[in-house]
């Protein structure tokens, strides 16, 4: 079986890229031939993947804002360049589109059996306040395109034989929003062998702290974390700067494993997630997660077993203070690790294969 995986942009630190790469690794381990196709992938990252025996075929080495606008508005240039790459390689039996940006590629009636896996965020991009803030003054124009964008996507997904989502929550939402039945979900695969408890590097347990992922100060959770940092020690992975919290910046995967492992608890970085890589990776490292009781967090976290689910910001702060004052049973760390197995590379790749057969 030969499988082609399509992603708009393969880049270090991207959840979409991790999905494509880890799924490819799992499929190869199961004896499948896999090619990754991307509109953009840097030469350095392509070389890194080659050392992992993964081949990426890409049109360009750097994504631009113009490219993003083209993708948002379904530019034929994006699709035509991707198809040139695909047609110049050996045909695949199956193609999996992982990027919402590439959903319209089947307008060209390509051969093979095609699957689309929705990660939710791009289709509902115009409801994402962080995105709209970053792309001001285009906000009003982008919001005006929301309904027409959904209608285009509703038409285009009808070209796919298989419709999947990255969580049960996403499956439910996208089935409703796009008015089509998404048949199943496949969790984004996490390298649970790599993300496991470790106590090395500079992130030693000199103090208990809560860990949170915040790319920058435009993230919706910044205000909440500001309040939390007044009460308990907080470390931030990302570039956000908050008084009272320690910003680690962008760190390597090795240091990320140690940051997770040494944290007393990880805070879910969003009030609503289609899937939380930070949550899955933290659980894999044996560190419980606290998050809002909505979105995919509900299917990832079992309250008082591998973490905690809260309804409000006040409840989040209160529970964190309680955790830091009284701790929790060590069995929660063991339960966290066990619960992460359903996100493993093996679990996700085998489920994908079974859904195709």
Where in this protein do the model-derived segments appear?
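Membrane-proximal helix-turn-helix segments that form the acceptor-binding/catalytic region
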Residues: 122-124, 131-163, 171-172
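Conserved catalytic-core segment of nucleotide-activated headgroup transferases in glycan assembly
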Residues: 176, 190-197, 201-244
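Conserved acidic donor-binding segment of nucleotide-sugar-dependent glycosyltransferases
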Residues: 215, 250, 303-314, 322-328
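Short alpha-helical segment that forms part of, or immediately flanks, the ligand-binding pocket
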Residues: 257, 279-284, 298-299
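Short alpha-helical donor nucleotide-sugar binding micro-motif in glycosyltransferases
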Residues: 258-263
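Aromatic "clamp/platform" in nucleotide-sugar-dependent glycosyltransferases that forms part
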Residues: 271
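Short hydrophobic beta-strand element within catalytic cores of glycosyltransferases
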Residues: 288-291, 301
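A charged, aromatic-enriched C-terminal amphipathic alpha-helix characteristic of glycosyltransferases
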Residues: 330-356
């Amino acid at each position: 079986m030969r499988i082609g995986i399509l992603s708009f942009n393969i880049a270090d630190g991207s959840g979409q890229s991790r999905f494509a790469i880890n799924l490819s690794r799992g499929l190869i381990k199961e004896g499948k031939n896999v090619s990754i196709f991307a509109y953009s992938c840097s030469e350095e990252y392509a070389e890194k993947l080659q050392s992992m025996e993964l081949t990426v075929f890409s049109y360009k080495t750097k994504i631009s804002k113009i490219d993003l606008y083209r993708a948002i508005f379904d530019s034929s240039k994006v699709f035509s360049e991707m198809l040139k790459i695909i047609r110049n390689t050996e045909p695949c039996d199956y193609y999996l589109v992982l990027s919402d940006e590439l959903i319209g590629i089947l307008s060209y009636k390509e051969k093979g059996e095609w699957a689309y896996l929705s990660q939710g965020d791009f289709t509902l991009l115009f409801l994402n306040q962080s995105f709209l803030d970053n792309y001001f003054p285009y906000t009003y124009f982008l919001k005006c395109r929301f309904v027409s964008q959904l209608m285009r996507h509703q038409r285009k997904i009808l070209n796919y034989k298989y419709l999947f989502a990255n969580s049960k929550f996403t499956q439910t939402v996208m089935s409703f929003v796009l008015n089509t039945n998404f048949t199943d979900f496949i969790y984004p695969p996490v390298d649970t062998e790599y993300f496991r408890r470790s106590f090395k590097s500079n992130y030693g347990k000199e103090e208990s702290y809560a860990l949170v992922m915040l790319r920058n100060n435009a993230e919706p959770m910044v205000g909440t974390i500001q309040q939390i940092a007044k009460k308990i020690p907080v470390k931030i992975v990302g570039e956000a700067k908050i008084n009272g919290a320690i910003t680690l910046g962008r760190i390597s995967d090795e240091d990320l494993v140690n940051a997770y492992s040494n944290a007393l608890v990880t805070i879910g970085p969003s009030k609503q997630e289609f899937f939380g890589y930070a949550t899955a990776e933290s659980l894999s490292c044996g560190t419980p997660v606290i998050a809002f009781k909505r979105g995919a967090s509900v299917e990832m976290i079992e309250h008082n077993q591998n973490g905690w689910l809260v309804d409000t910001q006040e409840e989040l702060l209160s529970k964190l203070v309680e955790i830091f004052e009284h701790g929790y049973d060590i069995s929660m760390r063991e339960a966290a690790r066990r619960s992460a197995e359903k996100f493993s590379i093996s679990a996700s790749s085998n489920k994908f294969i079974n859904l195709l057969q």
